[in-house]
Amino acid sequence: MENAKQSFHDVLEFVRLFRRKNKLQREIHDNEKKIRDNQKRVLLLDNLSEYIKPGMSIEAIQEIIASMRSDYEDRVDEYIIKVADLSKERRDLSKKLKTLGEVKG
């Protein structure tokens, strides 16, 4: 009976880890998309600032664009760090799942 309880607990743990691994993969994909989107925004702002000249508009617009660009770059950096953290956790879970699978096999 105790062995059956342990087996059931092991199966539940395996399912929990597998679901977490899948969730991490989805989060990684979502964050990679956010990275791409924000990199595109940075490029857009670069192009925009090439067209805006001091004689054509107020210099404050240049400052706003620079500030927006910096914000987007910061977001890209944050998402890159988050993806790295999620990837590490996913790799750790993969190793643990493999170990649990080998114990049963």
Curated annotation (Swiss-Prot):
Lineage, highest ranks first: Bacteria, Pseudomonadati, Pseudomonadota, Gammaproteobacteria, Enterobacterales
Keywords: Coiled coil, Cytoplasm
Task performed by this protein: Pole-localizer protein involved in the regulation of several cellular processes.
Keyword hit for Coiled coil: yes
Transmembrane segments: none
Compartment(s) of residence: Cytoplasm
Main location: cytoplasm
The protein's name: Pole-localizer protein TmaR
Keyword Coiled coil: yes
